[in-house]
Amino acid sequence: MGMRPPARMPKLTRRSRVLIGVALAAVVLLLIGPRFIDTYVNWLWFGELGYRSVFTTVLLTRVVVFLVVSLLIGAIVFAGLALAYRTRPVFVPTAGPNDPIARYRTTVMARLRLFGFGVPAFIGILSGIVAQSYWVRIQLFLHGGEFGVTDPQFGLDLGFYAFDLPFYRLVLSYLFVATFLAFIANLLGHYLFGGIRLTGRNGALTRSARIQLVTLVGILILLKAFAYWLDRYELLSHTRGGKPFTGAGYTDINAVLPAKLILLAIAVICAVAVFSAIVLRDLRIPAIGVVLLLLSSLVVGAGWPLVVEQFSVKPNAAQKESEYISRSIAATRQAYGLTDEVVTYRDYPGNAPATAQQVAADRSTTSNIRVLDPNIVSPAFTQFQQGKNFYFFPEQLAMDRYRDADGNLRDYVVAARELNPDRLIDNQRDWINRHTVYTHGNGFIASPANTVRGIANDPNQNGGYPEFLASVVGANGAVVSPGPAPLDQPRIYFGPVIANTASDYAIVGENGTPREYDYENNVETRNYTYTGSGGVPIGNWLTRSLFAAKFAERNFLFSNVIGENSKILFNRDPADRVEAVAPWLTTDTTVYPAIVNKKIVWIVDGYTTLDNYPYSELTSLSSATADSNEVAVNRLALNKQVSYIRNSVKATVDAYDGTVTLYAQDETDPVLQAWMKVFPDTIKPKSEISPELQQHLRYPEDLFKVQRALLAKYHVDDPVTFFSTSDFWDVPLDPNPTASSFQPPYYIVAKDLAENNNSAAFQLTSAMNRFRRDFLAAYMSASSDPETYGKITVLTIPGQVNGPKLAFNAISTDTAVSQDLGVIGRDNQNRIRWGNLLTLPVGPGGLLYVAPVYASPGTSDAASTYPRLIRVAMFYNDQVGYGPTVRDALTDLFGAGADATATGPAPANLPDGQPAAQPPNGQQPAAQTPGNQAGRAPTPPPAAIPSGPSGPQQLSEAKAAALQEVQEAMSGLQDAQRSGNFAEYGEALQRLDDAMNRYSEAR
């Protein structure tokens, strides 16, 4: 019986082919069109920022990698198919008219080019798309250098592990995938074209099929042998369950490492055995070789190390692992910047008795005790400084420091008054208003962290609110800048609040009369036209069409508010802008505003990281940086594993024009040096950091939190003690009853621990508990001062000194404290909130805990229930101090005179936006006497501090009259501030300035 001819495929009509072609073109356009639009938009955006070289370098690298890998993988797969086709048998018997292989063969032969070129091309393109995402690894291989440090096992420079080994592993994985796909393609090709037949008793295999398949299997085994070679080096950075450190341990060095070499030799022997089938024509030999390799990997690769671990290491693990633990301790300290050159350990009693005079003598700490919690006072900022419904402050504010008129260092709670488009209402929300009228924020607000306005002895009194210094656009467009530093341009076009909305773009530029809302006076609303250099021009129809497509908004094409001078501001988040121009950086989760050279800039910390530093502990950024503040706002770091981190870059983003500037902070970092070769001229040297900017650089929070988590273990020098964990520390939990995670570190101005002198320094601090206990083990401080920046001081504390939880429990359960707060919060009239519990070294060797207490109306968290400071609680050596002010609490705790150098509250009638008037001739305002508290006798008022040998001075008649004018001017300024009239506010501010001048001139 003859074989039935195969059925022909039905032909499509011309109309059907056209429709299918149009549909495919539409699909391709929908898939690729947005990519081209985004690419061109990014081209314009990077060019406007001055970082187009970054865009082109990344794009070119991705394209080259895509093309190379696509062609390589596609060619290898094509070769497997082509060889199977070209060496196919001339005659292939069939199993009858219903032979499925024959039908498939006929279909493939009818569309040979489609299958022969289409399948390899598809696989190659997919491989290229995946491979181009590894452009970072490739660039580091091409530009990486040496660390100047060798690993303790193989003696190789660490640059090999950081830059070379990841690339070799990447190449190996792609060669393995390509060879395996070629094997599958060749196998299927031979089966389809008759080189392999499964019919009959034993089947059939042509010589060509045998040679090709055996060769590919042999290549796979050789690649596996090379993988065993690379595995040896990766042992130095791997983790294994049950091992208390990262890197190769006793079992790895004495069992796994030799096993890798044995398996390598077996793999080479097996590869030779497989290749022998080319000549010997016996497939049993390669089959035996493959089985031998599999069995060897189980017995030698897994069984032997398991036996060594169970019977040699575990019975005496501390001694067996001690050498390798020492390696891990040294490597982890080096990788995370915790070496002896950076970290200084000092013994500190922690519970030394202190007299009132000793506490008062510690002026650098007691005069700067922080009572404002930046995570609580944001609603108060909103209530007093918001101004308009569309201005907004973040939920958590920032800490920074400035010097006052006398040159004293003070810490401030700072915030930029940004625009929040989500708070626009009614007709403010239409496209024109949202994107062309309400375009920017206005103002930099700072509050001294160590004082408040007035005293709130009673919840109904007007006191306890922050003292605001508001630098804003005032009457007639003049900038009102009372401090903490002079500011010329308070308008804010770039910031995290502005960017935290969908479609955060603004259209600015000169196009007729000014359109952007700026301020109001008692007559009219005054508008503004953006004059900054930032923004992508959209004056021509091409760019307007481009952005209309990008944002799916037709108003770009039809609105007359866009003219030839118009520009668009977008991508306005400072951290996102830094990550875009430096895609190799990991940025800190917090950015903060600062006044630098009379401009508002956002400061962003950038990290270079590695995940394969030999013997260094592998750490999760998201876990190590999580604390109660981050959890409260759901702001966690990337879930990224690192074993090396450096704060290599400090970046600034101009809040007005969006300019991004990158500075090299750690010029010795080999990873940074590699990226500076990849992107030359994009990072400025450290020497170009201006002194003004240097004064506002903070030791970054995320780095500090990672370091304290590691220092909890890696402060231990002895490997046996390390293994036992007996001397480990813990990061304490936040004792605040509303918290649910670790206690965050706190920025404070206090005694300089880095220099160990009596000067004040801005530092980031954290207490450390004993392992799984609530007693203190250490106190950690990282300096942010320019002279000692990055120096970490650790005060090690012996004995049983109460930690944060025990201190807070003692405060909150104190009879006087609990009864007083119970009265304030009775019947849900006020919500009591505990502020951050600060730990401060004071006196000859003690630790003072300070917790501000806030009250707000009602029990909700709404912004309208703005909190104010109602009490200050302290704890020192099992004693509790309590009162309405820092001075009262110090006096209650240590006795009269302890408050002599503490900062008192500002006048209660202090107007918004103005600093507290200083008492004449250096006199300090006396603290008010606290009321008769339950369970505690009234505290006597402290004596006035003499300004000189003759004691406190009396005001002259002229001086007293001038002081009265100052108070009247302050009252007028407060009324103007409350009215919201910027014109009256400016006039009142001028009257206050004149009154202050007359006061200073009076005799």
UniProtKB/Swiss-Prot annotation:
Subcellular location(s) per record: Cell membrane
Region of interest: Disordered: 902-979
Keywords: Cell membrane, Membrane, Transmembrane, Transmembrane helix
Biased composition (Low complexity): 902-937
Tagged with keyword Aminoacyl-tRNA synthetase: no
Transmembrane helix among keywords: yes
Family, as annotated: Belongs to the UPF0182 family.
Protein name as catalogued: UPF0182 protein Mkms_1433
Taxon lineage: Bacteria, Bacillati, Actinomycetota, Actinomycetes, Mycobacteriales
